[in-house]
């Protein structure tokens, strides 16, 4: 979170964390990039009183990390396409500056790291992005 602190402060986003004591074995640099994409979207599509909550929990030998915001959300009919290359949803088109590459690259990178990246959203209420880390023998702190 430290590397994305300026963006979050500048955007007025309050960050809450819960149970981030889980350990994963992964490439920290690329996971930081991946989280950056998710946090940038949360900051860009924020509500008037933006809050982003990061939480982690063990699921058997796997670890689930959730990044949830209370932003403007994604229309249900657009949700299946948000990871498509070049796709910019109606919210991105109306705000400008969107390339449609952020979530595409995030999904590709997650796959390369054997991390499952999923999205759930409700328009007007917010978005939840979930990273499911694979089970590994050698663990380091998240």
Stretches with model-predicted labels:
Residues 23-26:
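Conserved micro-motifs of the catalytic ATP-binding
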Residues 74-87:
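Short conserved segment of the HATPase_c
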Residues 87-97:
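Glycine-rich ATP-lid/hinge loop adjacent to the conserved G-boxes
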Residues 114-115:
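Conserved glycine-rich
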Residues 41-43:
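Short helix-loop "hinge" at the ATP-lid/N-box region of the Bergerat-fold HATPase_c
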Residues 69:
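Acidic ATP/Mg2+-coordinating residue in the GHKL
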Residues 49-61:
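Short beta-strand/loop element within the Bergerat-fold HATPase_c
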């Amino acid at each position: 979170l430290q590397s994305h602190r300026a963006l979050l402060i500048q955007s007025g986003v309050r960050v809450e964390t819960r149970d981030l004591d889980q350990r994963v074995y992964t490439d920290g640099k690329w996971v930081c990039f991946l989280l950056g994409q998710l946090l940038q979207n949360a900051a860009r599509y924020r509500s008037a009183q933006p809050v982003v909550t990061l939480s982690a929990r063990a699921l058997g030998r796997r670890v689930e990390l959730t990044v949830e915001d209370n932003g403007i959300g994604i229309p249900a009919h657009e949700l299946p396409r948000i990871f498509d290359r070049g796709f910019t949803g109606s919210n991105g088109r109306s705000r400008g500056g969107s390339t449609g590459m952020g979530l595409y690259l995030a999904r590709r990178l997650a796959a390369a790291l054997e991390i499952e990246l999923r999205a759930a959203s409700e328009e007007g209420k917010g978005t939840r992005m979930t990273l499911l880390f694979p089970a590994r023998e050698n663990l380091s702190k998240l």
